[in-house]
Each structure stands twice: as structure tokens, then as C-alpha cells.
A protein has these predicted regions:
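Aromatic- and glycine-enriched pocket-lining scaffold segments that form the walls
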Residues: 160, 164-166
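Cleavable N-terminal export/targeting peptides
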Residues: 1-27
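Transmembrane beta-barrel domains of Gram-negative outer membranes and organellar outer membranes
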Residues: 18-154, 166-168, 174-262
Length: 262
């Protein structure tokens, strides 16, 4: 049980903050700032986290977009934290994410994301996490379609925890209705490749092959254009898949953000 809880927390963190979105980069010298809050709940482990965050992206040169996202973790589940991964001592700034995207063609871009280890939030244990991949997007009438394929890897290993490679892929459809409201639906998938190593509650080492273990994260949401430069966005996400990835119970994740064009 302990191993599954730590794994589910770590993989949940990987899925929580992906690339900024699945659509083309902004025009040259355009930018966006976002202020939001996320909520994660996983019943069997009593994991409940509130995650305020602040982020900004800017196209510094034609087709080149740079971004940073700063999460802050507020532990709402004292039982889980004191019993398992001790997150009660890690409330505060989470691992910042640095992101870069380059638009190769109007339909294709590549991305590179780096999680910087400033905290032991979510079981990453001070490890750098690198994600890289490509995105394809296209407009189909009233539907803006975006998709992504990427690979995430922990750049360091230690005796306490070592995670396998994670293959990420997903797609989203935004429905343009010529009104201020834009509904969207999507799903992200996570497939593990390799071994996980670590220690259980008794201090005994384990080394398990998790290749092929997977989870799918479907989500729905709504965007409301308050003004041409100000958008309110809300979404809800759940997960289906193997318990080693998502935990014993079906998790629930919600997100509310305000996006401001700059």
C-alpha cells in the first residue's frame, strides 16, 4: 500500500502541470499570465491538496515561446502526510516548471519542460524531471484540435525512490461557438516504461518492473471570455487505470484559473 501511494502521488504530479497547452505558440512578442488554483483528491490515501499557482508565458522571438509556472502546495490531508510521505513538512512552494516551445510549422511544435527540485513535494525527492515531445494542432471549423506526445524522465536516482520513464500523450478539442463561452473536452494518457525502486515502510528495498502500467485522465472544461484579454477557465479531471499509477480509489482533480493576455 505504501509503495502505491507514493507512486500515485508522484505520477499525479507529472500529470498536474503539463505543457502550457496543446495549441500553437503565441504571436511574436505576445504573452499571457495565469493565476489559478487546483484541487487534488484521492480517497483511499486521504490525499487532499490545494495548489494555488502563478504562471506566465511570452514569445521572445518568432515561433519561440518561454514560460514559467510556480505552484504552491497546501496540504489538506494531515493523516496522509504524517503517515506516509510527510508532506506536512513540505507545504509551500512546489517544484517550479520551466517550459519552452518552438513552432516548426503552423501545425507542429516541439516542447521542453523542466521541473526544478526546490521541494520534496509529491515524492519527487529533490529530483530534476525532464519532459520533451511534440504537439500537433489544427482547426476543423468550429473545433480547435490539439494533441501532444511526450516523454518524462527523472534525471537523478537515489535509494529512497527511483521512478520509471513516463510516456505521455493526449488530445483536446475546443468548441468555438461564436459566444463568450468555449466548452472543451480532452484526455491525457500516461504509460510507464521501466522499473521503480525504493524502500517500503519496513525499510526493505523493492525493484518492480512497471512497463505497460497506464492511466487515462479524461477532463472537461469551460472557458469564459470576460474581455478580449481576460478569460476565466474551469475544468474537472478524473482518472482510470492501474492502481499503481492512480491509487486505490478514483481520483478527482479540479482547476480554476484566470488568464490575462499581455
Amino acid at each position: 500500500m505504501f509503495k502505491k501511494l507514493v507512486l500515485a502521488a508522484a505520477f499525479c504530479a507529472t500529470a498536474s502541470f503539463a505543457t502550457w497547452d496543446k495549441f500553437p505558440v503565441l504571436e511574436d512578442h505576445k504573452g499571457e499570465t495565469v493565476v489559478g488554483v487546483g484541487y487534488d483528491y484521492e480517497g483511499s490515501s486521504e490525499l487532499m491538496l490545494l495548489k494555488p499557482y502563478l504562471g506566465s508565458r511570452f514569445t521572445v522571438a518568432p515561433n519561440l515561446e518561454l514560460a514559467v509556472l510556480l505552484p504552491y502546495y497546501v496540504n489538506l490531508s494531515e493523516i496522509f502526510c504524517t503517515r506516509y510521505v510527510n508532506l506536512d513538512n513540505n507545504n509551500g512552494l512546489g517544484n517550479p516548471e520551466l517550459m519552452a516551445r518552438y513552432q516548426i510549422t503552423p501545425f507542429l511544435n516541439v516542447f521542453l519542460d523542466v521541473l526544478v527540485p526546490v521541494n520534496q513535494s509529491y515524492g519527487f525527492y529533490n529530483e530534476w524531471v525532464l519532459s520533451l515531445g511534440a504537439q500537433f494542432s489544427k482547426n476543423f471549423g468550429i473545433v480547435d484540435f490539439g494533441s501532444e506526445l511526450g516523454l518524462s524522465v527523472n534525471l537523478e536516482t537515489n535509494d529512497d525512490f527511483s521512478a520509471p520513464l513516463r510516456l505521455n500523450f493526449g488530445a483536446e478539442a475546443d468548441f468555438k461557438l461564436n459566444i463568450p463561452l468555449t466548452p472543451f473536452v480532452g484526455a491525457d494518457a500516461l504509460v510507464l516504461m521501466g522499473h521503480v525502486t525504493g524502500k517500503n515502510e519496513a525499510g526493505e528495498k523493492y525493484n518492480d518492473n512497471l512497463t505497460g502500467e497506464f492511466a487515462v485522465y479524461p477532463y472537461v472544461g469551460l472557458k469564459y471570455a470576460i474581455t478580449p484579454k481576460l478569460t476565466l477557465q474551469a475544468s474537472a479531471k478524473t482518472a482510470v487505470g492501474k492502481s499503481v499509477v492512480i491509487g486505490e480509489d478514483t481520483p478527482f482533480m479540479a482547476d480554476l484559473k484566470l488568464k490575462m493576455a499581455i
